[in-house]
Amino acid sequence: MSGSSGTPYLGSKISLISKAQIRYEGILYTIDTDNSTVALAKVRSFGTEDRPTDRPAPPREEIYEYIIFRGSDIKDITVCEPPKAQHTLPQDPAIVQSSLGSASASPFQPHVPYSPFRGMPPYGQLAASSLLSQQYAASLGLGAGFPSTPVGKSPMVEQAVQTSSVDNLNAKKLLPSKVTSATQLNGRQAQPSSKPASDVVQPAPVHTQGQVNDENRRPPRRRSGNRRTRNRSRGQNRPTNVKENTIKFEGDFDFESANAQFNREELDKEFKKKLNFKDDKADKGEEKDPAVMAQSEETAAEEDLLGPNCYYDKSKSFFDNISSELKTSSRRTTWAEERKLNTETFGVSGRFLRGRSSRGGFRGGRGNGTTRRNPTSHRAGTGRV
């Protein structure tokens, strides 16, 4: 590296030529001896500038916030300007941050170190080693120095450098939203401002204790309401095109053959003939045929088997013979009897019936918001059973 040995290189304006014969100018920010990289801030590419190369590159107007150069791909480094003298406060641990007036040419100097993505800190506050810059980047979660994602689109630049433009930096949103310093990107002085930057992500709103408590109480009610909605709508969202198992019939139903098996009229006629024949024989006192007697005995035996306690006989009727109120009592029960039966069955109900004492009990006055008690309504609506 050319330049006098006593020149403080950090903060100096550096002219760097890569092996691709492309010249860059920027401010030296850090030299990483472990990774063999050099980082420049506020970098501009001047192209190949008539240097002999197979792939010439034109100059570019963009100013990059930073570019990290690989040491093995650097051809020459020249110090163009030494760092400007910085008139800063002494390193006092009692100072949290400071700001000069608008008449001063020195920008706002925060005491807390940060990365040079949004304006570099004064180089008088930096040490000459790369360890300090690594600590800055580590505090922002940026690894050893800077992000390693190459952004430069030129094939010449991609071989030797890793770049990031201002637009790409704005897209990444790496900085806090509140900018309370007067740091500027183009060298012009700006007033201290506490307004949020337009290209930075806005912070989450700070909730007070009352708001946090309200937010902690409200979601369970929403979830319970949604649960009730789901319970009410259960079964309504079922698909309507579900096909049930249907029975397929090959032909029409034969009613004649089915009725022949269950011909109720013929069975009733035969049964009546047997009863009438037996009654006639008994009335006339005629001698009974032994075959008829045997048949009548079988019928009587069948009736005895059924017995008087046979409450249901499907051959005789669909209905049973269990006693009911229609058979036992011919008259309707009165309201008092039904109430007595309910009391014996379910017990005594509550003494005060709901809603009786509220009939005419209170009447609101018009306009004054007062209430008036009706003296007769309380006696009329005692609610006694």
Swiss-Prot record:
Q: Where is the Sm domain?
A: 2-83
Give the compositionally biased regions (Basic residues). Answer: 219-235
Chief location category = cytoplasm
Biological process (GO) annotations held by this record are:
maternal mRNA clearance; meiotic cell cycle process involved in oocyte maturation; membraneless organelle assembly; oogenesis; ovarian follicle development; regulation of translation
Q: Name one GO molecular function term.
A: RNA binding
Return the motif ranges for FFD box: 310-326
Residues bearing PTM Omega-N-methylarginine: R351
Q: Does the keyword RNA-binding apply?
A: yes
- For the motif TFG box, what are the positions? 330-350
Origin species, per record, is Mus musculus
> What positions does the domain DFDF occupy?
241-277
**What is reported when this gene is inactivated?**
Female mice are infertile, whereas male fertility is not affected. Oocytes display impaired early embryogenesis, defective progression to meiosis II and disrupted assembly of P-body-like granules. Show a reduction in the extent of mRNA storage in germinal vesicle oocytes, as well as an aberrant mRNA clearance during meiotic maturation of oocytes. Primordial follicle assembly is severely compromised in ovaries.
Q: Name one GO cellular component term.
A: cytoplasmic ribonucleoprotein granule
Q: State the protein's name.
A: Protein LSM14 homolog B
Give tissue specificity per the record.
Answer: Highly expressed in oocytes (at protein level).
